[in-house]
C-alpha cells in the first residue's frame, strides 16, 4: 500500500508540471505610442526590431510586443500589431506618428484595448482623433487601472486547425531550428507533423516551450518556442506560417488576389497600377502591385508568395512616403 502511494506521489510530481503548463492561459498585447511602460509590466526578452516583454502569474502568461524601430520603420509597427489580441496606446504627444499608430490598429480591426495619456495631452483632441475608427471604444485608464483591467481579461482562444505565424527563427547548437510565434488558431503538441507555408515543407515538432518552461501541448493564443525538424532557420522568413498539413483555410498565392479596398483619407496621392507597394498581411511584409476592378475592389498581385485566408485584413503601405505610410486597407476576398 505504501509503495502504491509512493508511486502515485512520484507520478503526480512528474505529471503536474506538464498539466499546469498545458492549462496555462495566454494574453498578448501590443504597446504603441510611448512604450517605456513595457518595463513596468514585464521582463524584457527577445529583442530585434521588435521587443517582447513577458510576465507569468499563477495561471496566465502575459506578453507585450513593442515595435522599437518605429517610427523609422512602419513595417515593425504593422507586425507588432498583428501579433497581439489586445492593444495599449500610451500617448505622450499628438503628432503624425500617433496618427499612423491609430491607422495601424484600425486597419486590422482592433476593437479591444486601453488608452493612457500624459497630463499634457488633450483628451478631447485624442478622442476626436480616434473617432470613427475601430479603437474608438478603447478604455481610457491610468497606470494603476491598466494593471487591474489586464488582470481581468480573458484569453481570445480560437478553435480549429493550427495556424502559427513565425516572428523569429534561429538555430541553437544541440537543439537545431527554433521558431517563435503566437498560435493564432488551434493547438500544437509535441511530435505533431505540420507544414510551413509558403514553402510547403513538412516539419516535425520536437519540443515546445512556454515562458522557458517545457510543455507537451499548447493552445491558442499561446506564445511558444518550438524546436522543429525539417527546415533550417535560414530558410524561414518572418511571417511564414506553420499549419496543419491538410489545412483547408490557408492559401498560398502568386497570382492576383481579389480584395476590398478603402483608401486612407490621409493619403493625398493616387495609387497607380504600375507602382510597387508593400502589403501587410498577418506579420508578412511583401511587395505587391494592384489592379483596380472598381472604386472599392482591387486585385492584389504579389511579387512573392503570399499566405492568407479569405476574410483576412490587410494594410497597403508606402514606406518611403513623407506623409502617412499606411495608404489603404481592406479585406481579402
What does each model-identified segment do?
Residues 97-101, 122, 142, 184-187, ...:
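Helical mechanochemical/support elements of P-loop NTPase systems and associated helical scaffolds
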Residues 36, 96, 100, 161, ...:
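Charged, alpha-helix-enriched surfaces in structured cytosolic catalytic cores
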Residues 164-185, 208:
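Short catalytic-site patches enriched in acidic/histidine residues
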Residues 2-86, 91-92, 183-190, 194-333:
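C-terminal effector/interaction modules appended to NTPase cores
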Residues 104, 108, 129-133, 169-172, ...:
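Conserved, well-folded catalytic cores of nucleic-acid-processing
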Residues 74-137:
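Conserved C-terminal guanine-recognition region of P-loop GTPase G domains, centered on the G4
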Residues 114, 118-173:
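Canonical P-loop GTPase G-domain recognition
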Residues 106, 151-154, 171, 184, ...:
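Signal for well-folded cores of large energy- and translation-related assemblies
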